[in-house]
């Protein structure tokens, strides 16, 4: 998106929540300059935002699918989510076979096609783990966490993880 006025334009490439309700906007000044107390207009690039939502949500389905196909030892080691692609880094002891890749793809696509609502709840980290949420060990969590649940599977969620990111409202919105 952009932050701009008649004398200034800033192209936003990333937004991150910092302390409380403080959000940091990262990007580049495209023209002009800005002074303290200047009025500005904020515009969201909705297509980019929707793409990032879809890819970010897909990482959760991919993670759980990998765990179901390859084993529960699989853990996320990192990811890159952009408006045109995603990369998902994970632990596993050996190369993945073509058959395993097909099974993972099948799991992800079947959950997307079920058109399940994506649910978020706020709870304590202890409650989240008791409710089956997958937490990344080594991460520090506050008194409350956001729990994301996706893909209703016969009364159970396909994926439940702690996550504060932006997500689709329904798995079908992934694409």
What do the predicted segments below correspond to?
Residues 1-175:
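A glycine- and charged-residue-rich anion-binding loop/surface
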């Amino acid at each position: 998106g952009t932050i701009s006025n008649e004398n200034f334009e800033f192209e936003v490439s990333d937004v991150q929540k910092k302390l409380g309700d403080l959000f940091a906007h990262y990007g580049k000044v495209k023209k002009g300059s800005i002074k303290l107390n200047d009025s500005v207009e904020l515009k969201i690039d909705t297509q980019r935002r929707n793409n990032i939502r879809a890819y970010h949500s897909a990482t959760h389905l991919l993670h759980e699918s990998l765990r179901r196909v390859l084993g529960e030892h699989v853990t996320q080691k990192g990811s890159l989510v952009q408006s045109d692609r995603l990369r998902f880094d994970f632990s596993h002891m050996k190369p993945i076979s073509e058959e395993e890749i097909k099974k993972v793809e099948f799991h992800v696509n079947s959950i997307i096609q079920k058109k399940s609502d994506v649910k978020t709840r706020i709870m304590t980290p202890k409650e989240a783990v008791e409710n089956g949420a997958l937490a990344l060990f080594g991460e520090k969590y506050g008194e409350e966490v956001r729990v994301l649940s996706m893909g209703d599977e016969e009364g159970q969620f396909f994926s439940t993880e702690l996550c504060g990111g932006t997500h689709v409202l329904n798995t079908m919105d992934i694409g």
